[in-house]
């Protein structure tokens, strides 16, 4: 089954039997449930919902179904067209809308699409609110508008420029320093909306650029997740010389990865670390990332006199914790930068502008900047279990086993994380498959993988 319903939205592959895939029937039901939730919440007096989408092949079809359904529910639709996830988030607050729907399957392959749901603040729904939407959808507890109360449809393509203007207006984005540095970059925008908005951003920053996979066709030239194994094309281009760096985004431009001038990966985990180091050097404070993210952020934060906090995995969990501890920056180790001075959402445009500002101020090569940070390696493994396995019971046993050791700090807000003095391992169950994901980090890849494999064996021995 490739239809996945969760508190953050609904996603699946296009085509196939109703109920098993992302199809018009389920899109109507889920959109209707969301509109019902927004109206009942009463959080906004607005009668407008923003809709934006990435460049996926199925995006036009899904957009038409979503917009028609919202109008049928009596909501006015503000369609901002091809837009990044952060652009759509900002459009909600800029337009004073009651909420927003982002049509994107993020880094998933071309046959996937999804609906991501926003509240009146342009932020993802909380777990409680997401559960309420699921409940409404399950019960089909919604009522459509009569003929005199149908919503209106409006298009507005100005939000890309408004997003860029908001980035340029950030105090820590030093436009003049970036222009004076005369950077030349290579960008892989993976045939989606990054190819629409990033040239405009780089033009405004005075950066010379070459784009790979620029056309927003949705026919991705390679696996769209911005990992080293998928980025051979741009890495080879960098190795030819003549560039200061490479920039890679995912299809909805909320994840960001850099490539050094020599064609080597900067490291997706270090996107947030490097941007945070710059922000903290100017505005000291606290930081947040999720439990599966590199310890390097903690090290950099403490270097600047701040405190680091970890949250459960998931953007809404990160932003909630950031608000709790008044973090000046946060995000996720997958290249997600969240800068509250802009908005509480992962934003590659903000990340690019802050990174280039830092590089311009330091006057060093990207590889030299990377070498200035603590070096850690993360290994990723998985434990395959049977459907009848009590995963929660296994995680409790792991917690009890290691909770007795004096040099181990145990965290159980999201699975079980074991923090040792010089390494850590995080065991987290999947919500959609009978597996436990195992993330481990140490100062060498061998040690990280060894720690992960050790915990995998501990789990196998418990069955």
Labelled PLM ranges:
Residues 13, 113-239:
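Gly/Ser/Thr-enriched, mixed-charge loops and adjacent short helices
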Residues 117-120, 257-261, 338-340:
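Short beta-strand-to-turn element immediately C-terminal to the catalytic PLP-Schiff-base lysine
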Residues 71, 132-165, 260-333, 337-338:
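Proline/glycine-rich low-complexity loops and linkers
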């Amino acid at each position: 089954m490739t239809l996945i319903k969760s508190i953050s939205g609904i996603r699946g592959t296009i085509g196939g039997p109703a109920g098993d895939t992302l199809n018009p029937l389920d899109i109507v039901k889920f959109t209707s449930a969301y509109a019902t939730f927004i109206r009942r919440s009463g959080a906004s007096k607005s009668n407008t919902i923003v809709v934006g989408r990435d460049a996926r092949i199925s995006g036009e079809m899904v957009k038409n179904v979503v917009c028609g359904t919202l109008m049928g529910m009596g909501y006015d639709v503000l369609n901002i067209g091809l837009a990044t996830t952060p652009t759509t988030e900002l459009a909600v607050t800029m337009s004073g809308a009651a909420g927003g729907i982002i049509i994107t399957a993020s880094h998933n392959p071309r046959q996937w699409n999804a609906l991501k749901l926003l509240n009146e603040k342009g932020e993802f729904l909380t777990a409680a609110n997401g559960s309420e939407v699921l409940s409404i959808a399950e019960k089909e507890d919604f009522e459509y508008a009569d003929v005199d109360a149908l919503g209106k449809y409006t298009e507005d393509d100005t939000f890309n420029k408004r997003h860029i203007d908001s980035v340029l207006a950030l105090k820590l984005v030093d436009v003049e320093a970036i222009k004076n540095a005369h950077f030349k970059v290579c960008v892989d925008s993976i045939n989606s909306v990054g190819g629409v908005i990033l040239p405009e951003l780089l033009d405004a920053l005075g950066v010379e650029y070459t784009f790979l996979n620029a056309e927003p066709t949705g026919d991705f030239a390679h696996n769209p997740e911005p990992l080293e194994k998928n980025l051979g094309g741009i890495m080879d281009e960098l190795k030819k010389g003549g560039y200061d760096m490479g920039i890679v985004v995912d299809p909805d431009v909320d994840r960001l990865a850099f490539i050094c001038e020599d064609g080597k990966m900067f490291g997706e985990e270090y996107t947030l670390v490097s941007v945070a180091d710059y922000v903290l050097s100017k505005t000291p404070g606290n930081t947040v990332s999720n439990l599966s993210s590199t310890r390097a952020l903690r090290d950099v934060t403490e270097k600047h006199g701040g405190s680091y906090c970890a949250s459960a995995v998931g953007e809404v969990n990160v932003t909630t914790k950031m608000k709790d501890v008044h973090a000046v920056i946060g995000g996720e180790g997958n290249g997600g930068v969240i800068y509250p001075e802009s908005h509480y959402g992962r934003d590659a445009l903000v990340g690019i502008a802050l990174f280039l500002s830092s590089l311009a101020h330091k006057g060093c090569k990207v590889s030299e900047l990377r070498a200035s940070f603590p070096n850690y390696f993360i290994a990723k493994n998985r434990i395959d279990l049977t459907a009848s396995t009590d995963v929660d019971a296994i995680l409790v046993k792991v917690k009890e086993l290691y909770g007795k050791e004096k040099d181990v700090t145990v965290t159980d807000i999201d699975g079980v994380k074991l923090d040792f003095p010089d390494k850590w391992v995080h065991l987290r169950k999947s919500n959609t498959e009978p597996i436990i994901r195992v993330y481990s980090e140490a100062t060498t890849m061998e040690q990280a993988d060894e720690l992960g494999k050790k915990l995998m064996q501990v789990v196998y021995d418990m069955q």
